[in-house]
């Protein structure tokens, strides 16, 4: 019923004022709730709107003194920790900021989400100490930040340590307790390693939820933008011995792409035992990651040692609904690197755990030649078989695990590769002197709890396959008492050194097939068997006495066996021109 104003019931003045005040309070609560409820949908709406517009490249507002500076000068610009965001608040998380400089020459917008507002964190030059770098505070007061760091007392309760950094394109790095910064993750990769050139989407704006005093996680939203893509991301950071980042993404394409990289990782590999340094170096290895690990949807585990090739190398591993993949640093002893400054043994592995089914696609590995360790030359990502349509959202959710405890990433039922050693192939002559024979040798150590429990004389065998560019001249498997595992030695004769050579190996053993347990007979089966037995006894009684009964057949066959896979699959590519 519509009530006409002229017949509406009269409300006393006091009650009317109370009702109006209650209404105002309710509106205030709803408004605060709506702001506090800022979520991925809000960022996705911005991404969708951007996708319908023409791309505008970010404009640099950086004075030449900052844009043209060298790395050493950029390092002189120091953020003052006492001026960190939330420095005086009781929250365990704090934020510090990167100043613009060098190639970090475009600002990003950084917002804070609180219980009652969303507000930009403005650039403030007083938060920095510039050393002897000349600058005009008035001319740069609206400069903007290049990125930010997340601080958290991960190692000591009274010390704020960097645990996450977001700087440049869509890159971010994360560490756990006792880690050193190593490899990076990215929001999205487009046309990586294609002749047309790679496109690097960038996070242009961030929204960070101010955490409560007892919160153990930090929520960061990010808006992605590039000539052919836009996207909304939610990153939930959970620091600990292993630091986790839960990623929710909703991406739109502005235009078609040839190769899409989901959950991309970027790392560095210069040399290691499987590809020793060409120049004499006291370090046995120098890398942020040493191999790509893949857990396929069918349960198979694969390990691919990394290379620093002379030519660009791209490998594609077909996988349907991957259970996980990542770039790992398995060698964890100081003696593996012998570097007091860079501590490569403390650099984390990063493991990606997809949420839901990702369908058919490939895990792609890109290896780029590099002459030194300052260049990230390794990229790994998931590439879907079916590319999304332009303008339609696609979502990929996953967890990033940053860890130095790689044994947690292995199946307890399978062994894994501890190390891959490469050497010039040789043979021992009658005088016991070894002589090179023109082959290349690989020694692969497989270890794991399942192998350690096997007696040394267990009949373990190798299953080896190589491409058509090599011939296997030795395939030798021995028990390794030092590791309580098995060492596989392969010597290969490469046909054409100008071509790459693929090889795979895994360890197997034969185990008896368990006979199926007989099913219990039902009452009907027992009755039928009793009737058949009585009928047989009657027929036997009617036979002539001189007719002998038939002898039972004897069996001398060996027990049936089946192959049991004992290890992950070692998959290696010997680069061309080596």
UniProtKB/Swiss-Prot annotation:
Main location (coarse class): periplasm
Cell compartments where the protein resides: Periplasm
Entry's Gene Ontology cellular component terms: outer membrane-bounded periplasmic space
Pfam families, per the entry: MdoG
GO molecular-function terms, A-Z: carbohydrate binding; catalytic activity
InterPro entries associated with the record: Gal_mutarotase_sf_dom (IPR011013), GH-type_carb-bd (IPR014718), Glucan_biosyn_MdoG/MdoD (IPR014438), Glucan_biosyn_MdoG_C (IPR007444), Ig-like_fold (IPR013783), Ig_E-set (IPR014756), MdoG_OpgG (IPR023704)
GO biological process: beta-glucan biosynthetic process
Superkingdom to which the source organism belongs: Bacteria
Record keywords, A-Z: Periplasm, Signal
Amino acid composition bias (Basic and acidic residues), ranges on this chain: 517-543
Region annotation (Disordered) ranges: 511-578
Residue spans of biased composition, Low complexity class: 544-554
HAMAP family: MdoG_OpgG
Family: Belongs to the OpgD/OpgG family.
Entry protein name: Glucans biosynthesis protein G
The organism's taxonomic lineage, starting at the top: Bacteria, Pseudomonadati, Pseudomonadota, Gammaproteobacteria, Pseudomonadales
């Amino acid at each position: 019923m519509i009530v006409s104003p002229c017949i509406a019931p009269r409300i006393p003045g006091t009650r009317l004022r109370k009702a109006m005040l209650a209404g105002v309070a309710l509106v205030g609560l709803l408004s605060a709730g709506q702001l506090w409820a800022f979520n991925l949908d809000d960022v996705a709406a911005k991404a969708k709107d951007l996708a319908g517009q023409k791309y505008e490249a970010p404009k640099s507002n950086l004075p030449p003194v900052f844009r043209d500076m060298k790395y050493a000068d950029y390092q002189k610009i120091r953020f003052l920790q006492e001026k960190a965001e939330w420095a005086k608040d009781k929250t365990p998380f704090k934020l510090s900021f990167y100043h613009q400089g060098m190639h970090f020459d475009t600002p990003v917008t950084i917002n804070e989400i609180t219980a009652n507002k969303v507000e930009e964190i403005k650039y403030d030059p007083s938060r920095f100490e510039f050393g002897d770098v000349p600058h005009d505070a008035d001319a740069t007061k609206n400069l903007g930040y290049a990125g930010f760091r997340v601080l958290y007392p991960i190692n000591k309760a009274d010390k704020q340590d960097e645990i996450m950094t977001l700087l440049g394109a869509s890159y971010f790095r994360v560490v756990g307790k006792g880690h050193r910064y190593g490899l990076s993750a990215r929001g999205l990769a487009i046309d990586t390693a294609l002749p047309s050139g790679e496109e690097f989407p960038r996070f242009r704006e961030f929204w960070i939820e101010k955490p409560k005093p007892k919160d153990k996680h930090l929520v960061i939203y990010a808006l992605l933008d590039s000539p052919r893509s836009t996207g909304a991301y939610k990153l939930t950071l959970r620091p600990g011995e292993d630091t986790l980042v839960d990623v929710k993404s909703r991406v739109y394409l502005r235009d078609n792409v040839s190769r899409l990289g989901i959950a991309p990782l970027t790392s560095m590999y210069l040399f290691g035992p499987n590809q020793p340094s060409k120049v004499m170096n006291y370090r046995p290895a120098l890398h942020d990651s040493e191999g790509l690990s893949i857990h396929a949807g069918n349960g198979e585990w694969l390990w691919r040692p990394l290379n620093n090739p002379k030519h660009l190398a791209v490998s594609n591993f077909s996988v349907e609904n991957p259970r996980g993949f990542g770039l790992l640093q398995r060698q964890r002893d100081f003696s593996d690197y012998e570097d007091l400054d860079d501590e490569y043994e403390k650099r984390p592995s990063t493991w990606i755990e997809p949420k839901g089914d990702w369908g058919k696609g490939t895990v792609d590995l890109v290896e780029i030649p590099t002459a030194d360790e300052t260049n990230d030359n390794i990229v790994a990502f998931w590439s879907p078989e079916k590319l999304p349509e332009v303008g339609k959202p696609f979502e990929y959710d996953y967890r990033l695990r940053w860890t130095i405890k790689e044994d947690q990433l292995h199946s307890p039922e399978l062994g894994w590769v501890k190390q891959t050693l490469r050497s010039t192939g040789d043979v021992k002559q009658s005088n016991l002197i070894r002589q090179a024979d023109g082959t290349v040798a690989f020694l692969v150590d497989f270890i794991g709890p399942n192998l350690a429990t096997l007696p040394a004389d267990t009949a373990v065998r190798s299953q080896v396959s190589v491409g058509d560019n090599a011939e296997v001249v030795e395939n030798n498997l021995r028990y390794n008492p030092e590791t309580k595992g098995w060492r596989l030695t392969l010597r290969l004769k490469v046909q054409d050194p100008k071509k790459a050579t693929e090889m795979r190996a895994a360890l197997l053993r034969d185990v008896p097939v368990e006979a199926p347990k007989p099913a219990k007979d039902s009452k009907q089966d027992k009755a039928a068997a009793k009737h058949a037995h009585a009928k047989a006894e009657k027929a036997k009684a009617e036979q002539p006495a001189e007719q002998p009964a038939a002898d039972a057949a004897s069996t001398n066959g060996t027990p049936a066996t089946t192959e049991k896979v004992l290890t992950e699959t070692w998959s290696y590519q010997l680069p061309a021109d080596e």
